[in-house]
């Protein structure tokens, strides 16, 4: 009889610990300040070499241990860049799909609670590095991009996004 009670107690304790761990993971993901819909604030952004996109919207949502990112950037020539990536924050390469001329893979790493670093590659070669920082109030996301774009031009962009 005591063995049955011991098993029941251990099972209940294990279930409680498992529930706490899972809830903690969900809460941590829900609190990720990168998650949300972000609209480019052109007045606060700088693009070198340019031209800047006409506008840009980035949607970031939780996906497993990382995020799914959906980017739409209408361009001055009337075209739209649309690309997506689902990646964990583990520094491993994940495919970039859509029409991003500068990348076909990305590796993402969480630096701290508000900062993500993304290393973009094209054909196995690093093209650009992005650092995405969310402000303390959670209303602004600043993305600094450095490197060389698909056209071989040196890139030094600071894109400021407002949370929608």
Model-predicted regions and their roles:
Residues 1-10:
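N-terminal secretory signal peptides that target proteins for export/translocation
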Residues 5, 21-31:
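Compositionally biased, disordered extreme N-termini, encompassing classical targeting presequences
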Residues 11-25:
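Bacterial N-terminal signal peptides
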Residues 27-164:
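Hydrophobic small-molecule pocket/channel-lining residues, especially in calycin-type beta-barrels
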